[in-house]
Amino acid sequence: MAAFSKYLTARNSSLAGAAFLLLCLLHKRRRALGLHGKKSGKPPLQNNEKEGKKERAVVDKVFFSRLIQILKIMVPRTFCKETGYLVLIAVMLVSRTYCDVWMIQNGTLIESGIIGRSRKDFKRYLLNFIAAMPLISLVNNFLKYGLNELKLCFRVRLTKYLYEEYLQAFTYYKMGNLDNRIANPDQLLTQDVEKFCNSVVDLYSNLSKPFLDIVLYIFKLTSAIGAQGPASMMAYLVVSGLFLTRLRRPIGKMTITEQKYEGEYRYVNSRLITNSEEIAFYNGNKREKQTVHSVFRKLVEHLHNFILFRFSMGFIDSIIAKYLATVVGYLVVSRPFLDLSHPRHLKSTHSELLEDYYQSGRMLLRMSQALGRIVLAGREMTRLAGFTARITELMQVLKDLNHGKYERTMVSQQEKGIEGVQVIPLIPGAGEIIIADNIIKFDHVPLATPNGDVLIRDLNFEVRSGANVLICGPNGCGKSSLFRVLGELWPLFGGRLTKPERGKLFYVPQRPYMTLGTLRDQVIYPDGREDQKRKGISDLVLKEYLDNVQLGHILEREGGWDSVQDWMDVLSGGEKQRMAMARLFYHKPQFAILDECTSAVSVDVEGYIYSHCRKVGITLFTVSHRKSLWKHHEYYLHMDGRGNYEFKQITEDTVEFGS
């Protein structure tokens, strides 16, 4: 106690009091953040994630289990490119550690030559240092090269895996429309994946190098000052590490919240760009500015809280991991020198004592710095836990969706039931899909949205190839819902649906999608050039398809089939609709769904398109309000929007409705 009493000065007592006060404030701040999260009743924009199912973001067994699961994706085999970079980094870390030890020893000898006024020793050891500079520089830059390449390799592996799952079948559609566990998947697939990979590689480097340093310096210091010094430092590492890890636990949760708010902010900006024309017509810039500022304000408020928390943690980290570690180092290294009876220094000269102390002190300083880096790496590990939780949640949701499982808040159907009407419980996927050519048949199929809104309780009708059907009714009656069930985008809640396989059913929307690529790609989408060749369809045939929809002139206007443009902007509304019809002729499906897809096309061109579809054997389901189209159909399906429908054959006595 007497040895430490000299440190209990007024100044040190004040510092200790300030540290204690900061710890109290930090604890209070953490409690306030927790209470704010529980009491806040304002639902964030696009916050579809289920409360009560929040992913944990702490460093525990669950975190390591998740991390190992993702690492198996990024390092798929024992012998692969990623393993090679891991080995390269390990070798460079060992080499760098030996370079550090050599530089300490050589630097001590240089300074010893200066103090001893030996021009010969000074010149020799200085030339050794100059000769070693290229090798040391090469080691450092090989290490940086390996780290950067490993980050890129990890990102490529993980991105490819996630996109394989995300773009499998209709998973990308189901995630946004049938499942509400993931908000803003674009944020997860881009920024979060990159940050996760960078964090993993940085952690590998920031942990491996300090551990190597500690092992080597313990070996060197044990022979110089005994085993008690390194043992004291290791004990300090364990105690301080556990203490700081406990304090850092909120970082993981705050990282998840930060990324979620960043995703919401990106979403409102992309939404503004996508719908800029409509917003401009409505003069909605003030309202949109309020929305953007509201979301940005929420992000900024969280970032302020995060910065304050990191400031508090940084203050404590610096004291415990850096300065107190240095104090412990001084206490440890000074013991054999201040003990006048220590056998190692009984006969040492002043120059030898100085050289021995300087070398031991530098090694111990490096060792304490290595211990400090390991303690501080806990902060990066806690942040990594946040990214790991988000990536793992995305992987689990993708896996569920690809196995036909999804979670969405279902509206209670007992609340929707009408008195006296039996409410039949709806179970997603309870229906049966039968694949058959040249027929579409709904047999006691309930038409319902994914969240349980029943549009038609019991739908029954049958259509065979060659019999076109006109579908009509008010907005919200279920026309688009019918097509989504038919295209297997929405689950079948019951009954039997007989239909051709997906490739024999084609959908043409009112606003056709124009892909990135050449003019040829617009006609053959989603096929590629190789698919076109395999089908034996030449460019001359494609030209005929364009001529059929009166778009033949566009080939010369835009510079040929291989011309690359932003086709969403280059083509007018009518040209895009006619391009979609040319795409329909190319694919020649058994059935096609035309959803107001000729609204911007003249009546004569529209009539020719329908006649050509009948000629090539494409049976049509048409949503339109044009009376001129009734003559091209054999049946009509009318929905009244109140759960009733009428499916009848069109005859001379049928009253046409529309405009």
Curated annotation (Swiss-Prot):
Cited PANTHER family: ATP-BINDING CASSETTE SUB-FAMILY D MEMBER 3, ATP-BINDING CASSETTE, SUB-FAMILY D MEMBER
Bilayer disposition of the protein: Multi-pass membrane protein
Annotated binding of ATP, by residue: G473, P474, N475, G476, C477, G478, K479, S480
Name used for this protein in its record: ATP-binding cassette sub-family D member 3
Species this protein is from: Homo sapiens
Catalytic activity: a very long-chain fatty acyl-CoA + H2O = a very long-chain fatty acid + CoA + H(+); a very long-chain fatty acid(in) + ATP + H2O = a very long-chain fatty acid(out) + ADP + phosphate + H(+); a long-chain fatty acyl-CoA + H2O = a long-chain fatty acid + CoA + H(+); a long-chain fatty acid(in) + ATP + H2O = a long-chain fatty acid(out) + ADP + phosphate + H(+)
Summary of the function given for this chain in its UniProt record: Broad substrate specificity ATP-dependent transporter of the ATP-binding cassette (ABC) family that catalyzes the transport of long-chain fatty acids (LCFA)-CoA, dicarboxylic acids-CoA, long-branched-chain fatty acids-CoA and bile acids from the cytosol to the peroxisome lumen for beta-oxydation. Has fatty acyl-CoA thioesterase and ATPase activities. Probably hydrolyzes fatty acyl-CoAs into free fatty acids prior to their ATP-dependent transport into peroxisomes.
GO cellular component: cytosol; intracellular membrane-bounded organelle; membrane; mitochondrion; peroxisomal matrix; peroxisomal membrane; peroxisome
